[in-house]
Amino acid sequence: NQKISDFLYDFVSLYGEKKWGVSMYDSQNSLINNYINPIIGDMEVQAVTPRVVDGYIQTLQKTASVSTKTRKATTTYVSNQTIEKIIKLLRCAFKQAVRWEIIGRNPFDNVVLPKTEYKKRDIWDAEMIRTALDKCADSKLYVAMNLSFACSLRMGEILGLTWDNVHISE
C-alpha cells in the first residue's frame, strides 16, 4: 500500500514531466505541495473513497490560501476555482492509479464540486491595444505585448521564443 504523497511523486515523474509544460508543471506541483500532501498526503491511496473525497473538499474550503513565489493569495480560504483545479489533478492522477492497477476504481469520478463563479473577461478592441502599446515605455515589454496581441501568444510562449523560431520574411 502506497501513501498518496509517494504516489503523486511517481505520478508527476512518470506522467506530468512528459505531458505538462513548464507553467502547468509548476502550478500542479504547487497544488500538490500546498493543498494535497499537507492534508491527505499520509493517507494510503487505497483508503480514498468518494466519502473521503467529499470530506477533503470540506476541509479545503476551511483551509487558508497559500501565497507562492509567483502568486499572492487573493482570498482568505482556498477558492472554489482552486478546489476545482485540485480535484481535476487528483482525478487525473487516480485515473492513472486505476490504469496502473493500484486501485480498482477512481474515487474522484462523479465528485460534486462547490459552485464556481467565472468572471467574464473583457476583450480589448484595436483602439485599446493601440493605447496600451502607446503608453508602454519599456522597449522589451513593448515587443512582448505586440507579439502577444498580434500572434495570440501567452507569456510562456513569448518568453520561450528564440531567434531560430522567428521567420520575419514569412
Where are these regions (language model features)?
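Residues within well-ordered alpha-helical secondary structure of globular protein domains
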Residues: 10, 31, 59-62, 135-138, ...
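Alpha-helical scaffold segments in carbohydrate-active enzymes
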Residues: 31-35, 59, 82-99, 154
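N-terminal DNA-binding module of tyrosine recombinases/phage integrases
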Residues: 1-54
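DNA-binding alpha-helical recognition surfaces that contact promoter or target DNA
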Residues: 27, 55, 85, 92, ...
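A short secondary-structure junction motif
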Residues: 11-15, 35, 39, 43, ...
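Charged catalytic carboxylate motif
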Residues: 7, 31, 52, 85-89, ...
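Short, conserved phosphate-binding/catalytic loop or strand-edge motifs used
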Residues: 46-61, 109-114
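Basic, Lys/Arg- and aromatic-enriched nucleic-acid-binding interface segment
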Residues: 66-80, 84-86, 99, 103-161, ...
